[in-house]
């Protein structure tokens, strides 16, 4: 902001959440144009400066092929597919809730689960015990999905369970129904507000983290 003022360069900012952080609230006073991802964020800035622009999506996670994606993820059945993702680092509460109903889920669905790299070993071990006499071939766990893996994940998933970060816009770009579980202690409570604004459009169901238990999911 200071550099733009000194050099007399027009300032453009982008707000990716439904509620702006302190920096963008401050910068908004000096910005010439302000792009927002959620309509709710517009009320925090001068109306004449604001444009609803969404969030840019990486092209490399779009445009998959379902047959190739199923092969890459080792999915060979014809059941509906639930995709579970907690961001690049995973989400412990979502992992625990998924494992809590994993036996029941895999009786009716294939489950593709990004656990987070740090959680992968523990989740995989617990899933192995849970599914010892179940449908272990229907559970597909990954510590981390790169861009091609994410493309396959979104391509095959019939329902997505996720946090409510910028991944909302990836889910929206694919047109997938979702269950969003906002991170409870996110800054400015932005994930919860993101989730409810998205839900107001009829695009998802929101489960708040304190209400999350295995059997709420199934």
Each predicted region: which residue ranges?
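Donor-nucleotide binding loops and adjacent catalytic segments primarily
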Residues: 68, 75-159, 192-196, 200, ...
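Acidic donor-binding loop of glycosyltransferase active sites
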Residues: 155-169, 176-177
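Well-formed, non-transmembrane alpha-helical positions, independent of function
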Residues: 26, 43-44, 152-153, 170, ...
């Amino acid at each position: 902001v200071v550099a733009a003022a000194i050099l007399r360069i027009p300032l453009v900012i982008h707000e990716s959440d439904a509620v702006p952080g302190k920096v963008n609230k401050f910068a908004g006073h000096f910005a010439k144009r302000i792009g927002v991802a959620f309509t709710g964020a517009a009320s925090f800035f001068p109306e004449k400066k604001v444009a609803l622009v969404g969030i840019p999506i990486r092209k490399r996670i779009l445009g998959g092929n379902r047959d190739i994606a199923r092969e890459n993820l080792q999915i060979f059945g014809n059941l509906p597919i639930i995709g579970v993702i907690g961001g690049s680092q995973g989400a412990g509460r979502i992992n625990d809730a998924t494992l809590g109903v994993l036996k029941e889920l895999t009786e009716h669905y294939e489950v593709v689960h990004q656990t987070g790299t740090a959680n992968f070993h523990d989740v995989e071990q617990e899933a192995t015990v849970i599914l010892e006499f179940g449908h272990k071939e229907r559970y597909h766990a990954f510590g981390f999905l790169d861009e091609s893996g994410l493309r396959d994940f979104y391509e095959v998933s019939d329902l997505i369970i996720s946090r409510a970060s910028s991944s909302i816009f990836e889910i929206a770009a694919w047109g997938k129904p979702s269950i969003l579980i906002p991170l409870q202690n996110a800054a400015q409570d932005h994930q919860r507000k993101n989730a409810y604004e998205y839900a107001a459009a009829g695009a998802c169901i929101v489960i708040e983290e304190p209400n999350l238990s295995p059997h709420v999911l199934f």
